[in-house]
């Protein structure tokens, strides 16, 4: 998908670590590199669509560090309404949260996080560029967008209207020199994405089967930010999924 546009908004802090955020965005999107069957799958028919949307988020965050939390929790609910003019009309709902608990004087941290999401068309079907996609950092061991329904013609991911994912992870510096800035992690990821308004030509569009993986990682705090190296293997997958053993990222680890 080729997408251009901009967003602007404001965040307001309240008592007890609660925050509110309001955002407005306008953008145009167009599906490119489609297979013969993908025109009916995307719902966009090669057109450039204008989206005008407003979002509201409320959350609570008590984590001690946004990039590298060792204790605390966060929870966030967001609603996005698209239909303030434009060609795209939908309501998207997201709920996400996480919890972090230190042990052994913070030398070992247990982290649990998860998210669920749903998008509904308002008088229109949900097009591909607005659906949820899963894989990569969300479910390590799978390629980016590697989980879920796929175009039978091109094999490309087409996304879904429903999503959930979660992670259980242990991070520790036990056995590592403190000044090195290195830690190790073991983790399990899981999730699924499914349901499209254009099921023709799609592989298993309504398959809700959970995918999962197990893996190991190395986390390194550097002057340019946290670096993460992950090795993971799927423990539950579908034949049409795309897997990926090694992944690298810069920034937040969970």
Positions of the model-derived regions?
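Gram-negative/organellar outer-membrane beta-barrel architecture
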Residues: 1-76, 90, 140-141, 145-152, ...
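Flexible, surface-exposed loop regions and adjacent strand-edge segments
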Residues: 2-3, 37-45, 94-96, 127-135, ...
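Residues on the lipid-exposed face of transmembrane beta-strands in outer-membrane beta-barrel proteins
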Residues: 6-12, 26, 54-60, 79, ...
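Short loop/turn motifs that connect adjacent beta-strands in outer-membrane beta-barrel proteins
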Residues: 14-21, 64-73, 86-88, 102-110, ...
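Structural signature of outer-membrane beta-barrel domains
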Residues: 17, 25-33, 63, 82-84, ...
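Hydrophobic core residues within well-ordered beta-strands of beta-rich domains
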Residues: 52-54, 73, 93, 110, ...
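Extracytoplasmic gating/loop element in the C-terminal half of outer-membrane beta-barrel translocons
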Residues: 106-195
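Outer-membrane beta-barrel transmembrane domain signature
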Residues: 107, 191-214
């Amino acid at each position: 998908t080729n997408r251009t546009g901009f967003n602007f908004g404001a965040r307001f802090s309240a008592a007890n670590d609660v925050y509110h955020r309001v955002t407005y965005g306008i953008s145009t999107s167009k599906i490119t590199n489609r297979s013969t069957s993908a025109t009916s799958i995307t719902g966009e028919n090669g057109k450039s669509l204008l989206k005008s949307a407003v979002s509201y988020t409320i959350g609570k965050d008590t984590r001690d560090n946004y990039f590298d939390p060792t204790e605390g929790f966060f929870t966030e609910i967001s609603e996005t309404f698209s239909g303030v003019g434009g060609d795209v009309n939908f309501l998207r709902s997201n709920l996400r949260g996480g919890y972090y608990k230190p042990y052994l004087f913070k030398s070992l941290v247990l982290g649990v996080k998860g998210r669920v999401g749903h998008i509904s068309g308002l008088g229109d079907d949900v097009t591909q560029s607005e659906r949820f996609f899963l894989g990569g950092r969300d479910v390590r061991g799978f390629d980016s967008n590697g989980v879920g329904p796929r175009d039978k013609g091109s094999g490309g991911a087409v996304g879904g209207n429903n999503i959930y994912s979660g992670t259980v992870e242990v991070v520790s510096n036990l056995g590592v020199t403190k000044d090195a800035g290195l830690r190790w992690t073991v983790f399990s990821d899981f999730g699924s994405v499914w349901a499209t308004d254009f099921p023709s030509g799609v592989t298993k569009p309504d398959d809700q089967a959970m995918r999962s993986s197990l893996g190991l990682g190395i986390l390194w705090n550097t002057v340019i930010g946290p670096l993460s190296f992950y090795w993971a293997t799927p423990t539950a997958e579908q034949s049409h999924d795309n897997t990926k053993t090694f992944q690298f990222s810069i920034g937040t680890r969970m």
